[in-house]
A protein has these predicted regions:
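Conserved small-residue
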Residues: 1-662, 681-684, 702-768
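A short beta-strand element within the Helicase C-terminal
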Residues: 671-674
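Compositionally biased, low-complexity linear motifs
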Residues: 676-703
Length: 768
């Protein structure tokens, strides 16, 4: 190696991530339940493992013997030897099963007895799999920034725990555990973690030191003083600081306010109304169940009396009549319960007003920034830029005065005093930051001012994630998008849809551009190219390299598998769903007639505005999971007027559009797949002409608040373990779509649509 080369190598600068850019990777410990078992529990657990090993060995031997017995004559001595051996093994198998069951009971009772003990991590054990004790990488977040974690370094202050046994989880959530001389306590478990039975435990000393910084001075004690809250919501909001984020530079909390959400009714909308349990229904159900329990207790007492009497004793007539009356009452109560239940899970098509939460999770920045999701303590959602000067000029041109806006705590602000407008739906804990009043009931300090004081006092951070930095029209369909068109899509349509991918596939080995496209080396379609892809663009001759040839072969095989699962390339992109920003400012800052929604905003009824596509192009808006037929086809509106307001690559949606009810999305950062594929749009239009497209509409009941404690958090998480699976209803919906075809009758299709609507409601209830 030459001196010059050595010098070049020495000059290579291996840069680490800059603090706060969101790109840092931190290594932490991830454990299962085995390291947390106490010595006596671990001993029994290993014995159970050995018994399972022996049992599985016997099962393999029995399988081998049974396969041999098929080909051996019954009179053969070898057959008799095999049968004798089989009987001995079956006896052993039964013995091991019973012993394993007995040991399992001992194991469970031991864990139950040890729930009050403080556990510790035993790292020197012979674990069943590496999943039980291994290091994992997590991305930079507000939590690990607070804890001083550094890029590409291991941190012993955050531990991810996967718990299979609820007894162990019960123990550690109440008592914590010890590791390397530090005590760890339960921190949180977000929705994504709960689905995987994961939870985050952190160094108690560091948590106490940074608690106010992470949660802006709001403690469980303050929440409990005001009646508590739903525990799973609390976990979701406290886990916001675990999101992979970058610091929001130049953010000034003093230039931010929180206003009421924009919500209104659109009259005379045709919907599929699904009845859900109301608070009165809950009370009625509870009353009926309690009355049935009383009847059961009374009948049990009568039965005990009968059993204690001598044989042949004649029962009093009054007792017989009383027993019959109680039985009849119990029967009537059960019928009432069935009547009450029969109202649930039924749908009917109605014409009724539909409530549109227009700014659900959405806020506006009057300073120029990229559209992004935001994370502040207990604040989350989407924020998009709307130019202040353009709005002021619009009001001036239309002779509309701009008045002050009132925040949710009653304080007024002019448009020049603020840069960031958050909404109540974004500020998750707004009700726990109360106004401070004097003796006469006058406001001394608003709840938002208290939040801002705490934010600055404790050094809280404003963060961003999913920042919009370039969107390419390069997306793929999935099987769900196609299955909802199964009654309309023909073989020719599928061939037309797959034509681009087929050409790319056939071009491998023949066409350089096709091969570059297949490998993702296309600047127009790939915004995140790696070094190999960039090199291929500069030097396409690298396609002859053995490694690249192997990569092409593997990519081709992968493409074929993707085709079989319905993944076809389309001219589309996943973009933020953004409410009409002009309409929002008009609603908050002017006295325009709020009963005439047609005058609000720049996006008119039946249109959307997305600058990625041409003016007057037909666009299909989709959302995942795409379970029912929800293809929202709209005309794209792009002109000189819209360009003033569309400062993002997102899709802007007008006030009169009920798309949010069809696609069931929120405006807190949900992305829609927006495309202009003519084949899909043609099939979707055919479907809607024949069978219609009616949004599901229901009132989702709210969970009751609870006091925040280790007990309530444990109960909430364990309940989520058992009731948080959306896979089952989603798979059932797929099976229903598979029963349909272009030859299906209208009656069959409408019945399927009705059943799918009910299962979609189940999925949404499970998610929320």
């Amino acid at each position: 190696m030459t001196k010059q080369t050595d010098k070049q190598i020495e000059n290579i600068n291996f840069d680490y991530s800059t603090y706060g850019d969101g790109k840092a990777i931190i290594e932490i410990l991830n454990i299962g339940f085995e390291p947390l078992l106490l010595p006596d529990e671990y001993k029994i657990y290993k014995e159970i493992g050995n018994l399972k090993y022996l049992r599985n060995g016997i099962l393999r031997t029995l399988k081998f013997i049974n396969s041999k017995l098929l080909y051996v004559d019954e009179d053969d001595c070898y057959y008799k030897w095999l049968m004798h051996h089989k009987l001995c093994l079956e006896e052993k198998l039964d013995f091991y099963k019973e012993k394993e069951k007995y040991k399992e009971q001992i194991f469970r009772s031991l864990m139950q007895r040890n729930k009050s003990k403080t556990r510790k991590i035993y790292s020197n054990r012979d674990f069943k799999s590496e999943e039980q004790f291994r290091n994992i990488a997590i991305f930079e977040s507000d939590l690990n920034r607070c804890f001083g974690c550094k890029d590409m370094e291991h941190s012993d202050d955050i531990i991810s725990v996967v718990t299979y046994y609820t007894e162990i989880f019960d123990s550690i959530i109440h008592n914590g555990f010890d590791y390397k001389g530090r005590h760890f306590v339960f921190f949180t478990a977000g929705a994504g973690q709960t689905r995987c039975k994961k939870s985050t435990f952190v160094n108690e000393k560091l948590l106490n030191k940074n608690f106010n910084r992470l949660f802006c001075g709001l403690t469980p004690e303050i929440i409990n003083e005001q009646g508590g809250m739903n525990t799973n919501k609390y976990l979701a909001y406290t886990s916001l600081c675990q999101t992979n984020t970058e610091l929001w530079k130049n953010f000034n909390i003093d230039r931010a306010i929180v206003v009421d959400d924009i919500e209104y009714n659109i009259p005379d909308q045709k919907v599929r109304y699904i009845y859900t349990e109301s608070p009165d229904d809950k009370k009625q159900m509870k009353y009926l169940q309690e009355e049935i329990e009383k009847c059961n207790e009374q009948l049990k007492e009568i039965k005990t009396k009968k059993q204690n009497r001598p044989r042949g004793f004649k029962r009093p007539q009054t007792e017989i009549i009383e027993e019959r009356n109680i039985q009849n009452r119990r029967k009537a109560l059960r019928e009432d319960i069935q009547k009450l239940k029969s109202k649930y899970h039924r749908s009917e098509v109605r014409t009724m007003p539909v409530t549109i939460p227009f700014t659900d999770g959405f806020g506006i920045s009057l300073r120029k920034i990229e559209s992004s999701m935001i994370r502040l303590p207990f604040i989350k959602g989407l924020i998009a830029y709307c130019p202040r000067r353009a709005f002021v000029d619009w009001c001036s041109a239309n002779s509309i005065p701009i008045h002050k806006v009132v925040d949710i705590y009653g304080k007024s602000y002019s448009i020049n005093e603020i840069d960031y407008i958050f909404t109540k739906s974004q500020f998750k804990m707004w009700k726990y930051y109360n106004n401070v009043l004097d003796e006469n009931g006058n406001i001394i300090k608003t709840g938002w001012e208290i939040y801002k004081e705490n934010f600055k006092k404790y050094g809280c951070d404003a963060c961003r994630c999913n920042v919009e930095r370039g969107v390419k029209l390069n997306s793929k369909t999935n099987y769900q998008v196609l299955q909802t068109l199964t009654t309309e899509m023909t073989d020719d349509d599928i061939l037309s849809l797959a034509s681009y991918d087929i050409n790319c596939l056939n071009g491998i080995g023949r066409n350089v551009q096709c091969m570059l496209n297949v490998l993702g080396a296309n600047e127009k379609k790939n915004d995140h190219m790696n070094w190999l892809q960039k090199s291929l663009i500069l030097y396409p001759e690298m396609l002859k390299d053995f490694y690249v040839k192997t990569l092409l072969k593997n990519t081709k095989d992968s493409m074929i598998k993707n085709f079989r699962s319905g993944k076809f390339s389309i001219n589309g992109a996943y973009v933020f769903a953004i409410p009409d920003t002009l309409a929002c400012l008009q609603y908050w800052f002017t006295d325009m007639d709020k009963t005439d929604l047609s005058k609000f905003g720049f996006v008119k009824d039946g249109n959307v505005s997305c600058r990625l596509f041409q003016n007057q192009e037909e666009l299909d808006c989709l959302r995942s999971p795409h379970l029912d037929h929800a293809h929202c086809i709209r005309k794209n509106q792009v002109n000189d007027q819209t360009k003033t307001w569309t400062k993002s690559n997102g899709i802007y949606i007008g006030m009169q559009d009920i798309m949010s009810k069809l696609l069931m999305y929120d405006n807190d950062g949900d992305k829609l797949l927006v495309h202009n594929n003519k084949t899909i749009i043609k099939c979707a239009k055919q479907y809607q002409r024949k069978h219609g497209m009616i949004p599901n509409y229901y009132d989702m009941p709210k969970a009751s608040p609870e006091l925040i404690s280790s007990d309530s958090l444990y109960n909430g998480i364990v309940m989520a373990y058992h009731h948080g699976n959306i896979g089952t209803p989603s798979n059932e919906i797929t099976k229903i779509w598979q029963t349909l075809s272009p030859d299906s009758t209208e009656e069959e299709i409408q019945h399927a649509i009705n059943v799918i609507a009910l299962r979609c409601a189940d999925v949404n209830f499970t998610i929320d």
